UniProtKB/Swiss-Prot annotation:
Keywords from the UniProt entry: Nucleus
Induction: Induced by leaf water deficit and fruit ripening.
Gene: ASR1
One annotated GO biological process: response to water deprivation
Identification of the protein by name: Abscisic stress-ripening protein 1
Biased composition (Basic and acidic residues): 86-105
Transmembrane segments: none
CC annotations in GO: nucleus; protein-containing complex
The family this protein is said to belong to: Belongs to the abscisic acid and water stress-induced protein family.
Region of interest (Disordered), ranges: 1-22, 83-115
InterPro entries noted in UniProt: ABA_WDS
Cellular localization per UniProt: Nucleus
GO molecular function: identical protein binding; nucleic acid binding; zinc ion binding
Basic residues: bias regions: 1-15
Length: 115
């Protein structure tokens, strides 16, 4: 009888960089552009909600404290989403730089990509 292979399901499936093959820079650029746009959308949405809660705090003095807390939380979420959009913008720029290096035939690997 053949022993059954046991598959262990882990939380994270890590792949070696060597096994991935060539990088599709166009796909990577589109991916980061999409995430950047989602980050911008999140910033606008959270900012709008913060303004709404600020208005509610003035309009509803009985529950003003609750609305002010929710305003602060929404403002923090807007800042976080803005930071994410900024991060993705730079990831997109790095992908464009790597694509240009590839097209030029430059084989040096950026130290950013190693860590």
């Amino acid at each position: 009888m053949e022993e059954e292979k046991h598959h262990h399901h882990h939380l994270f499936h890590h792949k070696d960089k060597a096994e991935e093959g060539p990088v599709d820079y166009e796909k990577e650029i589109k991916h980061h552009k999409h995430l950047e746009q989602i980050g911008k959308l999140g910033t606008v949405a959270a900012g709008a909600y913060a303004l709404h809660e600020k208005h509610e705090a003035k309009k509803d003095p009985e529950h003003a404290h609750k609305h002010k807390i929710e305003e602060e939380i929404a403002a923090a979420a807007a800042v976080g989403a803005g930071g994410f959009a900024f991060h993705e913008h730079h990831e997109k720029k790095d992908a464009k730089k790597e694509e240009k290096k590839k097209l030029r035939g430059d084989t040096t690997i950026s130290s950013k990509l190693l860590f």
